Structure formats: structure tokens, C-alpha cells
Amino acid sequence: MESSNQPNVLIFDSGVGGLSVFQEINKRLPEVNYYYLFDNQAYPYGELSQETLLARVEALVVKMTQQFAIDLVVIACNTASTIVLPALRAKLPIPVVGVVPAIKPASLLANRAVGLIATPATVTRQYTHDLIRDFAHEKEVELLGSTRLVDIAEEKLRGRQVDQQELAMILKPMKHKVDVAVLGCTHFPLLKEEIQQVLGDEIILVDSGEAIARRVQSLLHQLSPQSTKTPWRIFSTAQPWDEAALNGSLKTMGFNAIELYPL
């Protein structure tokens, strides 16, 4: 087992979208030793059965938690969070933080209508409709499910130019209909500037990143920051496409080159 004097935080996702969550946590807790694991072998998670998804996430997270003496786990994926949290919390003796679409804060900000931009799996899941019923029942809610937006975010992190015309076509059903839009997938804050440009500055964009960062900070409030900081480690379950370009972006965030971590 490897250990260090720094608190070890594992951030888990099916792709690189969870890096938007990492960035928010890192703003508050730059002294933490970060491990990022993405299960790109099974990407996208929205196409997996619940049983397969649960088995994969549980196996990977438990293994890495034990190997690297992890102190806290963040499941930085909306799809996985709706399925795996109870099982992981029962198995692990450490805090496990999940993400949910920020429908409640969006509803409080909205005057007339809330938009939820998410993956098709999140848009159709009962859990999401329960959130809408509980926290946004007095508002009109527009739902937009897009897998292509996830791919665009993955491409952007590899240095590809975002096609604003394509983005405008995808987001067209949301334009002029809502005053607050929820970025309901952790990939989407990576496209926040481009989405804002398409929807217009009058639309407020809300995501879960800051709330997750506050939660992690409160759970790790007894940290003792160290003056020296080592490069953080990032793992994938299969070789990523355009790995060299992706490693370039990851280096600017403080990560070492991607290491293979098969299931």
C-alpha cells in the first residue's frame, strides 16, 4: 500500500468530465494529493446496464482506494452517482461524495423556466424527475439530452476547436425558453464559455462543481497543508484516443502522464 502525509482524494468518472469537478475542488484545496481515474474502457456510462455499471465502479474504486490509501472519493459522474453511492458507502470506511444535477439552486434563481442540459441517460432517469418534482415543480422545466456535447468536451480537452454552429444546433431547443440552465453533466462546465456564448449572457449557467468542492472541503476540514506539492496522478482503464494531446492539457492542470489501470 502506498501512503503519504497529504490527504489523498480520488476523483472518478467515465471520461475527462470530472476534471471540471477537480478544478473546483483544487481551487479550495490545492494542498491535497489528487488521483483521477476514468473508466474510458466502458465510456459512455449512459449506455451500460445498472448492474454492469455498479460492478465496474465498485471494483475500480475499491481497488484504487485500498492501493493508494485514499481518504475521500468523489464520483464525478451524474449517471454513476445515481446508481453506485449506496453500495460504495456501505463498502468503504471513508466519505464518498457524489454529484447530482443542480436543479434545486437553479430553481431558486429562475424567474420563469429552468433548463436541464444533460446526457440522455440523466434526462430520462427517474432520479432526475424526482429532483424536478421536489425542487422545481413551480417552474417550467425544459429537458435536453445530448451525448454529442460530451464528445465535444472530450475533443476540446485534446485541443480541438469547438464548432459554435454545431453547438448552436444542439442547444437550439433551449434558447429563448429558459432563464437558468443547469449543466447536468460534469463534462459540460468544460464548455461553459462556449455554451454561454450560444445561449446568451442573460442566461445563468449553474453546475454542481462548487457545491461538491464545498462538501469535500467540509469533510476534509482538518487538513494540514504541505509546502511541497508533487504532480498528481491520472489513470485510465484503456488507452485514451489522442493521448499525447490529452496529456498536454493534463500537464497544465498539474497531472503526470496518463497511466493504464485496467479492471
From Swiss-Prot:
EC number: 5.1.1.3
Positions of the catalytic residues: C77 (proton donor/acceptor), C185 (proton donor/acceptor)
Pathway: Cell wall biogenesis; peptidoglycan biosynthesis
HAMAP family the UniProt entry points to: Glu_racemase
Cited function: Provides the (R)-glutamate required for cell wall biosynthesis.
Homology family: Belongs to the aspartate/glutamate racemases family.
Pfam family, one: Asp_Glu_race
Keywords from the named record: Cell shape, Cell wall biogenesis/degradation, Isomerase, Peptidoglycan synthesis
SUPFAM superfamilies with a match to the protein in the record: Aspartate/glutamate racemase
Keyword field contains Cell wall biogenesis/degradation: yes
GO BP: cell wall organization; peptidoglycan biosynthetic process; regulation of cell shape
Protein name: Glutamate racemase
Binding positions (substrate): D13, S14, Y45, G46, N78, T79, T186, H187
